[in-house]
Amino acid sequence: MRRVNILCSFALLFASHTSLAVTYPLPPEGSRLVGQSFTVTVPDHNTQPLETFAAQYGQGLSNMLEANPGADVFLPKSGSQLTIPQQLILPDTVRKGIVVNVAEMRLYYYPPDSNTVEVFPIGIGQAGRETPRNWVTTVERKQEAPTWTPTPNTRREYAKRGESLPAFVPAGPDNPMGLYAIYIGRLYAIHGTNANFGIGLRVSQGCIRLRNDDIKYLFDNVPVGTRVQIIDQPVKYTTEPDGSNWLEVHEPLSRNRAEYESDRKVPLPVTPSLRAFINGQEVDVNRANAALQRRSGMPVQISSGSRQMF
């Protein structure tokens, strides 16, 4: 996980970019596979960082890095191909309200009576200040132009880095919560940012961070009382109505500081149901194992006889 950690040090070099949700029609009953990934060509004489392309196509930096290993974060090579990972497997949970999957750093919003799902990239809590997992709560209130009162512990952490943090940060362009906040539970919020470098990274104090256009959309459209569920599913899988089997694997979140700072891959959680799925008669075990090793963050067809490349 060290690569993402290092990126945070340089992220303020990036320009600020807006984003828009990727909206998908809900699939028919029994299906969880939506969307389609595609590639784009980096323009000649490119001067833009990877964040520009991520924002343009509604992705976070982690999504782009998983799909494009080896891509230059600061200046993707002109003429190179970038995969935009817009195909995904919906999380294995109720399709209602807001669902946040911290492992893939995406927020899913199911607007009532719309038969669609809107997907937003997010930033989450840094190691040691994790965003809660396996939690169901509701939107308690919303606040335009929020203020921020850092906890004493947060101020101490900043002081250790040689940064002075005031006891109170008023609303405005210097507030790291951005211009809108949706408060969930009593201690956490879904909010904007004063710098888009955190989208797709673990950089917050535990809250959920979105690009500014995205949080404004949610602020305007998500009512108080909406159900919010936070899950941690680095591995998603589905057998579709046509019998095809798909596996989507993300880098799991590190469980402690040592894992976070290590170059080694964090072990994947292999549940009995996942093991049974992989060992099914219609699954190519070799392809499944390759997907578990590659961790591309994109659905891979692992049906026996499938010729999909990844």
Swiss-Prot record:
Pathway where it operates: Cell wall biogenesis; peptidoglycan biosynthesis
GO CC, one annotated term: periplasmic space
Endpoints of the signal sequence: 1-21
Record keywords: Cell shape, Cell wall biogenesis/degradation, Glycosyltransferase, Hydrolase, Peptidoglycan synthesis, Periplasm, Signal, Transferase
Pfam families linked: Ldt_C, YkuD
Top-level enzyme category: transferase
Disruption phenotype: Simultaneous disruption of erfK, ybiS, ycfS and ynhG leads to loss of covalent anchoring of the major outer membrane lipoprotein (Lpp, also known as the Braun lipoprotein) to the peptidoglycan. Complementation with erfK restores some of this anchoring.
Principal location: periplasm
Entry-linked Gene3D superfamilies: L,D-transpeptidase catalytic domain-like
Gene Ontology biological process terms in this record: cell wall organization; peptidoglycan-protein cross-linking; regulation of cell shape
Span of domain L,D-TPase catalytic: 96-231
Gene Ontology molecular functions: glycosyltransferase activity; peptidoglycan L,D-transpeptidase activity
Enzyme Commission identifier(s): 2.-.-.-
InterPro entries documented for this protein: LD-transpeptidase, LD_TPept_cat_dom, Ldt_C, Transpep_catalytic_dom
Active site: residue positions: 191, 207
Subcellular location: Periplasm
Family the UniProt entry places it in: Belongs to the YkuD family.
Oligomeric and partner information: Interacts with DsbG.
Role this protein plays: Responsible, at least in part, for anchoring of the major outer membrane lipoprotein (Lpp, also known as the Braun lipoprotein) to the peptidoglycan via a meso-diaminopimelyl-L-Lys- bond on the terminal residue of Lpp.
This protein's name: Probable L,D-transpeptidase ErfK/SrfK
